[in-house]
A protein has these predicted regions:
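Short, charged/polar N-terminal "headpieces" of proteins
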Residues: 1-19
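A structural detector for beta-sheet-dominated domains
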Residues: 12, 24-26, 80
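Acidic, low-complexity intrinsically disordered segments
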Residues: 36-86
């Protein structure tokens, strides 16, 4: 089972609401996690959102289910959407 690192992320959207999501990565690298968060936010039209280590912080490591491992092998990361995400 692939081990992944979970970064808990809270970002303010353009309309002012808070988006909560996790960034899953295969490498425990805080800067990479922030870059991945920015990439995903840009892809949904929220590229101006502030993402720093304050908004995106390491939470824990865990085993990855197959669909997550597949996405990480393909893209380097997986976004797990929680509150306020489109």
């Amino acid at each position: 089972v692939m081990e992944i690192h979970v970064y808990d992320t809270y970002v303010k959207a353009k309309d002012g609401h808070t988006m909560h999501f996790d960034v899953f990565t295969a490498v425990k690298d805080d800067q990479k996690a922030i870059e991945y968060a920015k990439q995903w936010l840009t892809s949904i039209g929220e590229g101006d959102a502030a993402v720093t280590s304050k908004e995106c912080s390491f939470c824990h490591s865990q085993g990855a289910p197959d669909n997550v491992a597949d996405a990480i092998n393909k893209d380097g990361y997986f976004i797990y959407k929680m509150e306020g995400c489109k």
